[in-house]
């Protein structure tokens, strides 16, 4: 996975979009780059919010079909885009682009304050991490998705 990790790092450096690649069978994280502090230091650490992460990953994975892209707002309030990786008709992994916000929406600060308080997070540190979450316009993602959607380099069929 080292070459794929390097490719993901180059992609993140070029456009700032966090990337994760998860095993389609067991959900193991195979590659991750640019994951947000709010996720790595808060959401994926606390048992309640971590369960939301797992449920969100599982839900978006269930939405994926060959040559389709799915967008989903996770239970912790952030967006992910999922892309299936199909090799010889086997769904082996999912590429997750995110976590991010759409520029067209204003993050619900009260939702995040409430979440921090309910889960016992340091509210100031949590909100500071929230401010670091990147924003992408739907238009810019519309331009990016066709270049990285499951095309010939991700979907291989038996001849």
Task: Tell me the role of every PLM-derived stretch.
Residues 14, 21, 84, 141-143:
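Generic structural microfeature
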Residues 34, 43-47, 85-87, 106-112:
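Surface-exposed beta-strand edges and their flanking turn/coil or helix-capping segments
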Residues 1-10, 93-159:
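Juxtadomain coupling helices with adjacent low-complexity linkers
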